[in-house]
């Protein structure tokens, strides 16, 4: 049973997701990261959030977010080993599993649609998006979906937002949390997309 109380951690994560996708986050983003640190959010949770912002707002957003984390909370990063064939297989399997969990009965339709746009886009969605990024540790699946809702609302991507509003509930986020994440993102909206 998911925790029904809205936590400081969730509040900070959805606010940071909305701020993190804005192209001019700058000092405001740094202050928000400082606040998250004071609120005792783990640094890893912020790094994970920064990495996943690449999926919604591209590498510039991820770079600037992680730059704010590094400025506020310096740390050494560990060297990474090269991915093995088994890693790629696991990312594919875990990505398919998580995507199916988020999209529920709409999973097969989503995959067919993405393939119709371009088979590479479908593969990248599963492997890079769901497998390599969203199945990592540091954040729960529900926290990742709430951050996704906030980021998509801030960016104004209504189609994708609708799917992830439902997906967040499917992975265990209470509806009240999903609505709060959406409202947080909408308050931070920086674009005029319809």
Model regions: which residues?
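Intrinsically disordered, low-complexity segments enriched in Gly and acidic/Ser/Thr residues
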Residues: 159-160
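Contiguous, well-ordered alpha-helical segments that form the cores/surfaces of helical PPI scaffolds
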Residues: 12-22, 145-155, 183
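Acidic, glycine/proline-rich low-complexity segments that act as flexible tails and inter-domain linkers
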Residues: 1-12, 21-39, 44-48, 54-141, ...
């Amino acid at each position: 049973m998911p925790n029904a109380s809205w936590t400081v951690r969730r509040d900070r994560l959805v606010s940071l997701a909305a701020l993190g996708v804005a192209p001019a986050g700058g000092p405001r983003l740094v202050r928000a990261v400082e606040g998250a640190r004071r609120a005792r959010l783990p640094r890893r949770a912020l790094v994970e959030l920064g990495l996943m912002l690449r999926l919604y707002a591209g590498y510039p957003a991820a770079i600037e977010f992680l730059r704010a984390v590094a400025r506020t909370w310096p740390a050494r990063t560990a060297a990474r080993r090269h991915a093995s064939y088994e890693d790629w297989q696991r990312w594919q399997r875990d990505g398919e599993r998580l995507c199916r969990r988020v999209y529920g009965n709409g999973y097969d339709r989503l995959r067919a649609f993405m393939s119709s746009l371009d088979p590479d886009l479908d593969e990248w969605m599963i492997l890079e998006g769901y497998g390599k990024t969203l199945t990592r540790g540091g954040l729960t699946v529900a926290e990742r979906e709430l951050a996704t809702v906030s980021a998509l609302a801030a960016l104004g991507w209504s189609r994708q937002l609708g799917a992830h509003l439902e997906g967040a509930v499917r992975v265990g986020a209470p509806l009240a949390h999903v609505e709060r994440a959406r409202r947080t993102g909408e308050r931070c909206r920086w674009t005029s997309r319809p």
